[in-house]
Every structure is written in structure tokens, then in C-alpha cells.
UniProtKB/Swiss-Prot annotation:
Residues 1-19 form the signal peptide. Lignin degradation and detoxification of lignin-derived products. Keywords: Copper, Disulfide bond, Glycoprotein, Lignin degradation, Metal-binding, Oxidoreductase, Repeat, Secreted, Signal. This is Laccase-1. It comes from Thanatephorus cucumeris (Black scurf of potato). GO terms for cellular component: extracellular region. The lineage of its organism: Eukaryota, Fungi, Dikarya, Basidiomycota, Agaricomycotina. The gene is LCC1.
Length: 576
């Protein structure tokens, strides 16, 4: 995970007198790689997977020039980048989702994202937000350091080596998987940590050539920034023989919480401290998939004091048996819809019915977990400004968001509507409106709901699909307070604060304040489900987007994106 060259020098832990502009360059290209030992064509960032670590300090401004060098017609050739978790105050034009806040960047063109970081700190990531493109490799870590980190006394080491970006992996392109209409091909074949993994762990040695290796010194404490950059996979993360102390979730510092392991869904981030307090040896960093059978991401933790030649860990790496509910999900005979995020209209989903019958004998038997302390997400207490967004008062506006699956078409829906990308980006529609933005300005398929400004909003997110899987739901432009999980008692005093929350059919209730005008995408972070319609847009205070102290001011390069994209479509009809 090589770091790009800074154009402006940044001191990580020395408080700056003035905020700086930190510049990066990302070249998006096609190339052949084999992160798990099997070669495939992928979408690369600066020639690699994952992309380089982007980092800066609290208060800095990021300027990231993205150059599109994509040429392979069997892959997506246009692109856009989303900066997951960054709030983008007055900056919705650089949030990144194609056809929501911008038109895509076409081949042989570039676009520079300028992002004031303001008071945000923590662990984030960036990824393509064009159809399912990030599945093919366009993803990387992003960290905003706090020179006055309130947890600084808890760790000794926090650098690029302790950033762990985990991701599921496929041996065929996402475009081909979507075109097949076969749900069984949505199952990842392996998983990686910092771009290394083993497709066939039983016949591939575990060593620093095949697995990411973190070297530690006995007695030191390491801040691990764990990022789940997966398309669908959720993981249970642990370090063999060591406890971990959770200190942040989704960029929000939390009260320290010591556990043996924690679950992390697609899009989520967990910061934890591990103390190197065991006998010098080699230990597994384990991340078995909890929603896909018989797959595990691994890395190695090696004590520098162990002077012996390299040797693998003594014990087997942790395996995990998926629940019967997950087996039921992969056994469901439902069609797989596609084509809803094209942005150019006219695509009709060609769907093939698919099912995968998993015999119980093929699933690893569940290990005895009675002595393992696993993080309870409901116990994540924000370190600063705890409390629900609405306080003890009722929300100003309560919206029920019920997700479900149309088994006939294979499309996921929210409140009965599968989202489909518009031809004109939502933000552009808002900015060019002359007579007051209303919901009638958007088609039913765009599924855009207007939120009033400076109000406390409550979403009741629940499902009626009957499919027992946890959906990682993400809202751009905000963090939210999770005041209730399922039928558990609500918590308005110190609820968890995140930007991705897992929801089953039983549901969750979340609260946030509409203090950030812009069109913000809400969607399932299982990218197949997003592509199949599990999304909608909240146009927050649209009149304030057009004018006033919180307005979004676009520049000429942003204004030129759609014209370039329209011209590209003329010679590449029906493509992305």
C-alpha cells in the first residue's frame, strides 16, 4: 500500500498554525493483478490495489486530482470517487456519487476534488461510486489525524502500517457478474487485507509474500485502523492471543471498550488498540467472513524480538461458520436485477434465475464462542457530545423507510420503489431550478425526498423481505445516532454514532439534524443491492443549496463534466 508523493509536506502529530492544502494525484487505470494468487484484470489506483493511503490533519483541505486512464471495454471506463464518511459541508458537488452529485469522469479526462476537512478526524476510505466499479479494485484508505487526539495516551504507534483495509475479492469483473443476472456469482471467492490474501489457503503457504505482515515490538501499543471496503462481506476481526480496545467507530471517537473481537460490515471502520504483550512469536490477524461460507481474510502479526527464521502461527487461523439464516439467503431462488445505476436510461434488466444449494456438511461447524467477548455495537458511546440528535424531544419529522425485494424482478426497493439513476444529476437539477424545488421535479424512479433545513429527523429503517441478512445502510453527508436496534429498548442518552448501520428486517431507528444542505444518497452498502435499487436520495434544504450561507458553489470544471460525458456517450452508447 504505497503512499503517493505529497506535493505539500504534512506533519502528522505537530499542531499546525494554519490549515494547509494537501494535494494528491490518483491515476485510475486497468491492469492485471493477483492479490489472492489468481490473476485477473482489475481497476487500479496508481497501478495498485488497494489505492494509496490518503492522509492529512484536522482542518486541512484535500485536493485530489483524479485522472481517468481506463481503456478496457469489458470493464467500466468512466468513473467518480466518493470520500466515504466526509461530511462535505457546502461541498456536495465533490461528494462523488455518479448521477447524484456529478456526472462521471470520462476516459482521458481528469477532475480535481477539493474537500475542506473542517473539524473532522478519524478513519475513512475512498471508492468508486459509479455502478459496481469499486468491486473491481477502485478503493483505498483515508485518514484524518488529530494532533490533539483525546485517545493519544492509549497508543504508541499510529502510522500507515497500522491501517488495515479489508476487502472481499472476485475473479471476474463486476460488469460480467451483473450481466449474468446470477445471484450465485455475487459470492466473493476470497478476501484480502492490504491487498494480500489466499484464494486456496489449504495449498498456499502463509508467509509475508502471501499475507500482509505487521511487525510489532513487545511492550508497544498499536492503533489499528480497520476498514471494511467490501462489496458484500462482513467480518469478525480479532488478533490471535491478544485483546483489542475499541476507541473509534466510523470516524467517531468512543469511550474505550475492550473486547476479544468485533464485527464490521461493508463500509464501516473500527479503530482499536492492540498491545504487543505476548511471547515473541507469529500470530494470526483473523477476519473470517460472517455472511459468506468458508472464507477468511488473514494477515500476520510478527514480534520483532522473535529471532527465529520466519515461521507461521502455531494454531490454525480462525474459521467461522455462517448461520442457518445466511445459508437461507444464499439458497433463496430469486432473480438478480441489474441496470438501475446506468444514468443514461434505456437499460432493461436481463435476469437469470439462480440459486446455490449449500449442504450443511460444506459449512465449517461453529466454534465454541462462549468465552469470546465480542463487541456489542449498542455499547459504543461517543466520547464527545453524547446524546441523541433530538435529545429527549420527539423528532420534527419521522420517516418510515421499509426495504424489500421484488422476487419477480430481482430489484431491491425502499417503500416499494427501486431507485434508478437519473440522466441529469440531482444536484444539477437543484441548482438549475428556477421556481422552487419540489418532489414533483424528480421522477418516481429517482426516489428523491425533500428534507426541511435545521430540523431533527428520525428514520425508522426496517425490512419486509423475509431474507435474513444484515444490510449496511449508509447516508452521505451525515453521521447519525442509532437510538434503537430492533425491539431493544431505545437509548436517547448515549446512543452509538455512525455513518453505516446494520439493519435486518427487525430494523433500526436513527436520528440526525438537517444542518448540511445538499442531495445526500442513502443506500445499502452491499453494492449488488445498491445496483439492484436499494437506494434513495434526500434533497436536504434544496433552496439553501442554491443560495445563502450554506449554499453549494460549483466551479467550471464541475460544470463541464456532464457535457463531456454526453459527448462520450454519443460514441459509446449505452455504456459506463
Amino acid at each position: 500500500m504505497a503512499r503517493t508523493t505529497f506535493l505539500v509536506s504534512v506533519s502528522l502529530f505537530v499542531s499546525a498554525v494554519l490549515a494547509r492544502t494537501v494535494e494528491y494525484g490518483l491515476k485510475i487505470s486497468d491492469g492485471e493483478i493477483a492479490p489472492d494468487g489468481v490473476k485477473r484484470n482489475a481497476t487500479l489506483v496508481n497501478g495498485g490495489y488497494p489505492g494509496p493511503l490518503i492522509f492529512a490533519n484536522k482542518g486541512d483541505t484535500l485536493k485530489v486530482k483524479v485522472q481517468n486512464k481506463l481503456t478496457n471495454p469489458e470493464m467500466y471506463r468512466t468513473t467518480s470517487i466518493h470520500w466515504h464518511g466526509l461530511l462535505q459541508h457546502r461541498n456536495a458537488d465533490d461528494d462523488g456519487p455518479s448521477f447524484v452529485t456529478q456526472c462521471p469522469i470520462v476516459p482521458r479526462e481528469s477532475y480535481t476534488y477539493t474537500i475542506p476537512l473542517d473539524d473532522q478526524t478519524g478513519t475513512y476510505w475512498y471508492h468508486s461510486h459509479l455502478s459496481s466499479q469499486y468491486v473491481d479494485g477502485l478503493r483505498g484508505p483515508l485518514v484524518i489525524y488529530d494532533p490533539k487526539d483525546p485517545h493519544r495516551r492509549l497508543y504508541d504507534v499510529d502510522d500507515e502500517k497500522t491501517v488495515l483495509i479489508i476487502g472481499d475479492w472476485y475473479h471476474e469483473s463486476s460488469k460480467a457478474i451483473l450481466a449474468s443476472g446470477n445471484i450465485t456469482r455475487q459470492r466473493p471467492v476470497s478476501a484480502t487485507i492490504n491487498g494480500k490474501g489466499r484464494f486456496d489457503p489449504d495449498n498456499t503457504p502463509a508467509n509475508p509474500d502471501t499475507l500482509y505482515t505487521l511487525k510489532v515490538k513487545r511492550g508497544k501499543r498499536y492503533r489499528l485502523r480497520v476498514i471494511n471496503s467490501s462489496e458484500i462481506a462482513s467480518f469478525r476481526f480479532s488478533v490471535e492471543g491478544h485483546k483489542v480496545t475499541v476507541i473509534a467507530a466510523d470516524g467517531v471517537s468512543t469511550k474505550p471498550y475492550q473486547v476479544d473481537a468485533f464485527d464490521i460490515l461493508a463500509g464501516q471502520r473500527i479503530d482499536c488498540v492492540v498491545e504487543a504483550n505476548q511471547e515473541p512469536d507469529t500470530y494470526w490477524i483473523n477476519a473470517p467472513l460472517t455472511n459468506v461460507p468458508n472464507k477468511t481474510a488473514q494477515a500476520l502479526l510478527v514480534y520483532e524480538e522473535d529471532r527465529r527464521p520466519y515461521h507461521p502461527p502455531k494454531g490454525p487461523y480462525r474459521k467461522w461458520s455462517v448461520s442457518e439464516a445466511i445459508i437461507k439467503y444464499w439458497n433463496h431462488k430469486h432473480k438478480h436485477g441489474r441496470g438501475l445505476l446506468s444514468g443514461h436510461g434505456g437499460l432493461k434488466a436481463r435476469m437469470i434465475e439462480g440459486s446455490h444449494h449449500l449442504h450443511s456438511r460444506s459449512v465449517v461447524k461453529r466454534q465454541n464462542e462462549t468465552t469470546t467477548v465480542v463487541m456489542d455495537e449498542s455499547k459504543l458511546v461517543p466520547l464527545e457530545y453524547p446524546g441523541a440528535a433530538c435529545g429527549s424531544k420527539p423528532a420534527d419529522l419521522v420517516l418510515d423507510l421499509t426495504f424489500g425485494l421484488n422476487f419477480a424482478t430481482g430489484h431491491w426497493m425502499i417503500n416499494g420503489i427501486p431507485y434508478e439513476s437519473p440522466k441529469i444529476p440531482t444536484l444539477l437539477k437543484i441548482l438549475t431550478d428556477e421556481d422552487g424545488v419540489t418532489e414533483s421535479d424528480f421522477t418516481k424512479e429517482e426516489h428523491t425526498v425533500i428534507l426541511p433545513k435545521n430540523k431533527c429527523i428520525e428514520f425508522n429503517i426496517k425490512g419486509n423481505s423475509g431474507i435474513p441478512i444484515t444490510h449496511p445502510v449508509h447516508l452521505h453527508g451525515h453521521t447519525w445516532d442509532v437510538v434503537q436496534f430492533g425491539n431493544n429498548p431505545p437509548n436517547y442518552v448515549n446512543p452509538p454514532r455512525r455513518d453505516v448501520v446494520g439493519s435486518t428486517d427487525a430494523g433500526v431507528r436513527i436520528q440526525f439534524k438537517t444542518d448540511n444542505p445538499g442531495p445526500w444518497f442513502l443506500h445499502c452498502h452491499i453494492d449488488w443491492h445498491l445496483e439492484e435499487g436499494f437506494a434513495m436520495v434526500f434533497a436536504e434544504a434544496p433552496e439553501a443549496v442554491k443560495g445563502g450561507p450554506k449554499s453549494v458553489a460549483v466551479d467550471s470544471q464541475w460544470e463541464g463534466l456532464c457535457g463531456k460525458y454526453d459527448n462520450w456517450l454519443k460514441s459509446n452508447p449505452g455504456q459506463l
